[in-house]
Amino acid sequence: MGDSGDAVMARWLQSAGLQHLAASSTSSSSASTAGGGVDPRGGGGVGVGALGGGAGGGSLLPSLLMQGYGPQSIEEKQRLYMLLRSLNFNGETAPPSISEPYTPTAQSFGGGNSLEGFYSPELRGELGAGLLDLHAMDDTELLSEDVASEPFEPSPFIPKEMDEDDDDMLPGSQPGPSDNYNAVANEKESTARENNVAKIKVVVRKRPLNRKEVSRKEEDIITVHDSSSLTVYEPKLKVDLTAYVEKHEFCFDAVLDEQVSNDEVYRETVEPIIPIIFQRTKATCFAYGQTGSGKTYTMQPLPLRAAQDMVRLLHQPVYRNQNFKLWLSYFEIYGGKLFDLLSDRRQLLMREDGKKQVCIVGLQEFEVSDVQIVKEYIERGNAARSTGSTGANEESSRSHAILQLAIKKHIIVTDTRRQRDRDANESKNTKAVGKISFIDLAGSERGADTTDNDRQTRIEGAEINKSLLALKECIRALDNDQIHIPFRGSKLTEVLRDSFVGNSRTVMISCISPNAGSCEHTLNTLRYADRVKSLSKGSNTRKEQPTGPTIPSSKDSSSAPSYPMPIETEEIANQIQEKRPVETSRKAAENFTSNSSMEPDRNPVSMIPSYSNRGKEENGSSGLNDRERVDLNSSRISYNSKPQSVQSSANLQEEEKVTKVSPPRRKAYRDDKPERQSNYAKKDSGPETSRPGYKVQQAKQLQQQQRPTSASASQNSSRQSEKESSCDDVEIDAILEEEEALIAAHRKEIENTMEIVREEMNLLAEVDQPGSLIDNYVTQLSFLLSRKAAGLVSLQARLARFQHRLKEQEILSRKKSSR
């Protein structure tokens, strides 16, 4: 049975990659049986020579190896390692034998506990701590260089489409799970790329010095440090005319120096926006800067490159199957008016439809499918654009040119009745998907630099600056996510209204001049751009305003504790009560019908003679309803009043309502406040003053005493006013008559003057005739001039009299008003 155990061990070692141990195990099998070895079938006894010189370990090895397939302890694993180490101390290796891999049988799983009683003293000495130090042992002999590698076979459960490319797929094959995974990954990448596109991007481009500036030996005052920052060195003079340089640093999304080409400008500004236009995005790209800074030069190639990329995307199957088409329109805004540059400068009208969408009536759009056609349209529009000469640029753009490239989806018409008119109304059968607008703004100007310009040029500059300011405010509102965007500030922002709402993107290219003479213009442009760029999302203006302290209404006041209010709190309540809206007073007036038991002298609300006065009175009186109830209850308890007193109090309440029709003045009420406070203090002093109808009786007596005097005074004042009004009417009628006479005299004088002028013209014509007499000319001219002078003198005298009458009337009116 020893040979069979050696064969099993050899096969197992080969399957485990330990072929070099097969020779040592085979040679030790005979020695193990002679020295009292271990039965290879996993017997019970172990001889003394089992570990003698390492020879007996070969028979112990198969049983230990078989234990690896069943449950084993840490000590058994350590014994296996020590036996494997003792088998190859001499370093002898045997050539690997080719055999089938060994598969253990069911009998081999039963030797899990065959060596539980095996504890060698030598093994106990080395493994006394119970743990094996693997770093202290030399296990390099366990590795073999002659390991036969077998070819790797893929798992049959993995689909083969994962290893194949999409281009190698068969035409009729269905997309597998890998296609869906790739589609999801691509969609995530595109979404991330769209999110990375900023809502507002500010790019600054510096132009090189031109010939005129080089001939004047002007210096370059702008230094571009990296792709996002620059420094402006502004030359200045101190008060003592000492020259110094002031440094200004700016940071933007991108800074392009004079070495950057237009292709790089396109890749930095417009190229990231093109893919998202096909996903219902409206983009705007405009160049801003002083006149002569290179705006038109920067903007000219951008629409061509954008059209090229858009046409390329339209040819893709995704968009071609959706019937997407590219449309082009080109117009300008000059002096607040719109002109179509592709239709012989025909004037356009801007209207709003029922959906609050801006529509340009009469604007002609052209469907384009080739970049060459786009180039021809742009050249045609540039030739018709308004230009002029300024002090800084001989051919300056005096209008805002807007080139729009729109992606529209064509709707297939199936009705035969509408099919005949489809060619005529092809643009109506489309649905807008996205749009990008390229705006070549007119140059900004300062009033100090336009002194040598004519009036028309200055008017153009004022209109340009107004529209640029409105555009800046719209961009600020857009970046702050404000609800209201002031697009009605100018025609430019009204036209671009749809580019500032919804899903929109804006790219601003600030063009600057590097010469020292344009330093102030450059700084203004950079500050304009920096103000647009520096807008943060955190400074949102749509924040909730802090709510101030609120005063409880009449409903809440009834539940409040009924304590007497001090003077300071009453004044504060009066001030806040005056600022209440009319609605609050109306609500209080409605509540007054249910809470009508109150006193007029205890009304804590300021009485203003206005239409909302009554509501405020009732509101304030209802506010002290509980306190009055406490007073009434105390008076009833102290005096044990009978039901007759209830009837008298009801009568008094009716009298109170009558007195409330004519409220007292505010001034008198304010003077009466200390008296009311003293009345509050005197409540507990005597029984008569605490009665609720006592003060009402006093008020009635005072009113009866004042009635005759007030009636007589009112009669006298009415008589005097009637006399004064009759006198005033007479004087006003006289003044009006004199005014009409003066106007008639002026008209007559104008007619006489015109007649005299005709006679003078005839007189000059006669003098020019040959043979005319100079004496007749002098005599007639003297007569005409005297007539003219007499008419002017009479008109001037009439005017002086009327002016004197007006002054007298003004003095009298002042005296009457002082009385």
Curated annotation (Swiss-Prot):
Residues 632-652 have a biased composition (Polar residues). Ubiquitous. Keywords: ATP-binding, Coiled coil, Endoplasmic reticulum, Microsome, Microtubule, Motor protein, Nucleotide-binding. One of its GO terms (biological process) is trichome morphogenesis. It is found in: Microsome. Its main location: other. The keyword Nucleotide-binding applies. Residues 199-535 form the Kinesin motor domain. Residues 550-562, 697-719 have a biased composition (Low complexity). GO terms for molecular function: ATP binding; microtubule binding; microtubule motor activity. This is Kinesin-like protein KIN-13A. It holds the Pfam family Kinesin. PROSITE patterns: KINESIN_MOTOR_1, KINESIN_MOTOR_2. Residues 150-178, 534-729 are annotated as: Disordered. ATP binds at G289, Q290, T291, G292, S293, G294, K295, T296. Belongs to the TRAFAC class myosin-kinesin ATPase superfamily. Kinesin family. KIN-13 subfamily. Residues 736-767 form a coiled coil.
